[in-house]
């Protein structure tokens, strides 16, 4: 019936996921093959307009063209390591007030423990911006960004844009997109989010999870099935099926937020009475409407998940897609740990990285457990963890377990109903609403420590270790239930399904007064005369020149890993404190992956072009043009940009004179957009064998017409004593606005 593939999560024996790599139609909650749907009179062209995704996108599209979308969002959100740059850039473009609700949360540099006053200076700036321009300011420790947006801003049929890659509220009927800061700048300057109409993937859920299986287990199984082959890359996931009704809202939210790790563009779910009740409980009953695909809705491909077959999962270092069942790891721990050690040696150069020393009598012991943030710190997850630990303890050894409720209302409810007391009595450490463990700014494990976390990512050094100081640690992702089960056994890896647990989820009461008393809400009430308050670390962007017709690039970094993450391009953790200072932050670019990059990039900027290079260039473009060459640096990476939406992964290169990236492909749409918005050429070179190497100079010619007309770019590799070697690059699809930005040199220039 289908051209499909049964997915076994690594070495597991249970059929969990089926991928259908062809078009399907939706009818009566089931999926029909394209052939069968056409035989029943359905049309793919009409069916595409019957999806939930299409209806929401169309309602927000200002272009009048179903294929070329220009989206205006209903609301936006940023946290304290992105909003300063966004507002500064918008000010340069003429910002007078926020034209849509804009929420500024302070959940990343919340501890104010690095750099003296600089983190709190950013927070003071954020409050002054909310006052001046009319926004919402959520102070530190009140809520992580996505918890607040779910609780206070989501609504059926709405669209929200966030400067964080995990901006996902699909389970609440809201299409949400995580992008780099410049895309938010465009909205603040009353421009649009321009994309080609995305393809849509039906994710059909059936069955019901077994006790002990949580949202992270479902999410990791999905990520493990679709990430490596790009099955859903840059597509919208539309969750349908009768299995949805068997999932509480917070369970759905927990799956939904992790869809970012599949490399999809956005997500949306069918809504029901549980959605209605959640929105009503949070003071927005009018935000509910029933969302479901119409009969005959057409999807470009599909994924089917049997929830009853999903097992307790673990994603091994160093990516969420390295998903195994915990049962597999328990059975084959030595082999699986050695695979992780091999990956560390090959990809990180970490020859001394060891996990097999965590084995005791054939059983795996971990050093730390964390349940935190938008994925882990939900009310239901922490109640489930308390159920597992009730009457037990985490032990008096090296193992520790910390929990981070995602918001103060959640924290308050857990305290009122005794759940937090149960956790504390078991030896659990209570933290605040803080994203630190997700990006390396909180609960950093010991050197060579192995931490299990219900958070969003386990990329290299994402837990906060500093390889440059000889440190290394690692994280495996798990669900809160199995983390609690492991804690109950004092660090011995344990699936929650191995234990007999009576799960109790007390009724949740949301107290919105917590926010009303502490959060500033200035939506629609800008105070134009109010002054912005700047700390000494908050600086303007440097001047960036417009693109010229000829460009001499020097290759200053060459990375051949299968995927390069944004964490490798610009580290998170302590480094994030400097994101309000472009020049200072740029000093950390590629510091963990290629420590020599910054010095090489600076040398390109500061040193004159050698006469021999000018002579070689003159042979191609003429002597006059060669005497006035624009110059800059370029990096090569096979597939850069997986992970965070942080614009600094691109802007830091730009500050150091970066003018382009060369790649076989770009891991995410958002990273490519960040390059474009900072005026950098997103060059494509698909060949495995490279005609250029580290230190080579590449002359690009005829750039202005190539960008304007979308044609191939002609380049020449210039080496002393050798004839210029011709090489061709592609740019890929560019919107008219993106072309304008690249030609102007960056988004700010194009807005002036």
Predicted segments — roles?
Residues 2-752:
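Fe-S-dependent hydro-lyases/dehydratases of central metabolism
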């Amino acid at each position: 019936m289908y051209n499909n593939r049964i997915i076994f999560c690594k070495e597991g024996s249970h059929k969990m996921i089926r991928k259908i790599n062809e078009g399907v139609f939706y009818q009566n909650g089931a999926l029909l093959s394209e052939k069968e749907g056409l035989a029943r009179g359905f049309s793919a062209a009409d069916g595409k307009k019957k999806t939930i995704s299409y209806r929401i996108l169309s309602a927000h599209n200002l272009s009048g063209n179903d294929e070329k979308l220009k989206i205006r969002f209903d609301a936006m959100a940023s946290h304290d390591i992105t909003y300063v740059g966004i507002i500064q850039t918008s000010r340069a473009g003429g910002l007078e007030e926020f034209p849509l609700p804009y929420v500024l949360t302070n959940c990343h540099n919340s501890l104010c423990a690095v750099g003296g006053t600089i983190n709190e200076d950013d927070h003071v700036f954020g409050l002054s911006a909310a006052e001046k321009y009319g926004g919402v300011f959520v102070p530190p420790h009140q809520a992580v960004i996505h918890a607040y947006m779910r609780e206070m801003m989501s609504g059926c049929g709405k669209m929200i844009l966030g400067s964080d890659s995990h901006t996902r509220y699909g389970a609440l009927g809201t299409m949400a997109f995580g992008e780099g800061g410049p895309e938010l700048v465009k909205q603040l300057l009353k421009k649009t989010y321009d994309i080609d109409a995305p393809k849509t993937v039906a994710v059909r859920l059936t069955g019901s999870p077994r006790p002990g299986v949580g949202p992270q287990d479902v999410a990791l199984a999905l990520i493990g099935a679709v990430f490596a082959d790009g099955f859903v890359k840059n597509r919208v996931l539309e969750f349908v099926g009768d299995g949805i009704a068997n999932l509480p809202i917070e369970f759905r939210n927990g799956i939904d937020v992790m869809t970012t790790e599949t490399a999809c563009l956005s997500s949306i779910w069918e809504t029901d009475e549980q959605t209605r009740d959640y929105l009503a409980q949070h003071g927005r009953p009018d935000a509910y409407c029933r969302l479901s695909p119409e009969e005959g809705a057409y999807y470009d491909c599909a994924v089917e998940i049997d929830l009853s077959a999903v097992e307790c999962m673990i994603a091994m270092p160093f990516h969420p897609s390295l998903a195994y069942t915990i049962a597999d790891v328990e059975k084959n721990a030595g082999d699986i740990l050695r695979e992780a050690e091999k990956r560390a040696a090959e990809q990180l150069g970490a020859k001394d990285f060891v996990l097999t020393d965590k084995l005791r009598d054939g059983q795996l012991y971990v050093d730390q457990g964390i349940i935190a943030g938008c994925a882990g710190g939900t009310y239901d997850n922490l109640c489930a963890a308390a159920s597992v630990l009730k009457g037990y303890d985490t032990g008096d050894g090296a193992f520790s377990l910390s929990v981070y409720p995602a918001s103060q209302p959640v924290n308050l409810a857990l305290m009122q109903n005794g759940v937090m007391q149960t956790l504390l009595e078991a030896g659990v450490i209570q933290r605040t609403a803080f994203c630190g463990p997700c990006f390396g700014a909180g609960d950093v494990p010991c050197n060579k420590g192995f931490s299990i976390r219900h958070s969003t990512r386990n990329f290299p050094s994402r837990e906060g270790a500093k390889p440059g100081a000889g440190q290394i640690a690692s994280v495996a992702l798990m669900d809160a239930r199995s983390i609690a089960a492991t804690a109950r056994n004092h660090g011995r890896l344990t699936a929650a399904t191995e234990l007999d647990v009576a799960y109790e989820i007390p009724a949740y009461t949301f107290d919105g007064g917590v926010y009303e008393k502490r959060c500033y809400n200035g939506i629609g009430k800008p105070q134009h005369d109010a002054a912005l308050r700047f700390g000494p670390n908050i600086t303007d962007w440097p001047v960036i020149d417009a693109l010229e017709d000829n460009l001499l690039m020097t290759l200053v970094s060459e990375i051949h890993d299968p995927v390069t993450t944004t964490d490798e391009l610009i580290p998170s953790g302590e480094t994030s404190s400097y994101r309000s200072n472009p020049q200072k932050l740029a000093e950390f670019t590629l510091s963990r992956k290629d420590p020599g990059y910054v010095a090489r990039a600076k040398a390109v900027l500061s040193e004159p072009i050698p006469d021999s290079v000018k002579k070689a260039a003159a042979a191609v473009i003429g002597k006059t043009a060669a005497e006035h060459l624009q110059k800059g640096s370029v990096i090569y990476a096979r597939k850069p940009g997986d992970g965070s939406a942080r614009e600094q992964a691109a802007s830091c290169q730009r500050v150091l004179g970066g003018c382009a990236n060369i790649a076989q492909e770009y891991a995410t749409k958002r990273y490519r957009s960040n390059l474009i918005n900072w005026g950098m050429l997103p060059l494509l070179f698909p060949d495995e064998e490279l005609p250029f190497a580290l230190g080579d100079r590449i002359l690009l010619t005829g750039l202005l017409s190539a960008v304007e007309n979308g044609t191939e770019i002609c380049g020449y590799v210039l080496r002393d004593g050798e004839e210029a070697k011709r090489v061709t690059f592609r740019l890929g699809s560019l919107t008219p606005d993106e072309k304008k930005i690249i030609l102007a040199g960056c988004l700010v220039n194009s807005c002036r």
